[in-house]
A protein has these predicted regions:
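Class I SAM-dependent methyltransferase SAM/SAH-binding core
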Residues: 1-44
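Conserved acidic residues
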Residues: 34, 52, 81
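A conserved beta-strand element that flanks and buttresses the S-adenosyl-L-methionine
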Residues: 55-56
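Hydrophobic adenine-recognition pocket in adenosine-nucleotide-binding enzymes
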Residues: 59
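Class I S-adenosylmethionine-dependent transferase superfamily signal
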Residues: 75
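Conserved beta-strand signature within the Rossmann-like core of class I S-adenosyl-L-methionine
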Residues: 79-90
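C-terminal alpha-helical "lid/dimerization" subdomain adjacent to the S-adenosyl-L-methionine
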Residues: 88-134
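Conserved Class I S-adenosyl-L-methionine
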Residues: 121, 125-156
């Protein structure tokens, strides 16, 4: 928000989560002026708010292929500039390494289980490319990050509405 203010631009940041505890934690530990909304994004009633950019971190593994296709189709009509996903990449190596380091690290049982589930349910690049194609998205960029993560950037301005 500081960067936007330094450029004399108005910005409204909205955090959406279905988990009340996550939202309470975020509100207590926030450094930015963010409006938080409790909604179930996976619900068929959920409406993506019109905005300039949609940024999602470590979430799309909750969607089935078809749900993600529908979400992307809907998002293209609501987002002005870009959709950005920061996600895990599913692989045998990442799963095995998480199991190993999870054993060594003092993670709670829940964190270990959630981490393994997230890796098992995350997408491969090929799967995401097929999903993007089905959603009518032809322009996108993958940026690979350490520890089996990637950033997927989908510019919206180049898509036909």
């Amino acid at each position: 928000r500081k960067w936007f203010r330094s450029k004399d631009k108005k910005v409204r940041l909205i955090g959406i989560d279905g988990n009340k505890n996550s939202l309470e934690y975020a509100k207590k530990h926030k450094d930015f002026e963010i409006e938080y909304i409790q909604e179930d994004i996976l619900s068929s009633d959920f409406q993506i708010p019109k905005c300039d950019a949609l940024i999602s971190s470590h979430f799309i593994y909750h969607f089935s292929d078809q749900e993600l296709i529908q979400f992307l189709k809907s998002a293209k009509d609501k987002i002005n500039t870009a959709i950005v996903f920061s996600e895990l990449q599913r692989s045998k190596i990442s799963y095995t390494l998480f199991k190993f380091f999870g054993f060594l690290m003092p993670f709670s049982k829940k964190v270990k289980q959630d981490g393994l589930l997230a890796i098992r349910r995350s997408f491969t690049r090929r799967e995401l490319e097929n999903i993007l194609k089905e959603a009518g998205i032809n322009e996108y960029y993958f940026r690979w990050k350490w520890w089996f993560r990637f950033i997927l950037i989908i510019p919206i301005s180049s898509h036909d509405a």
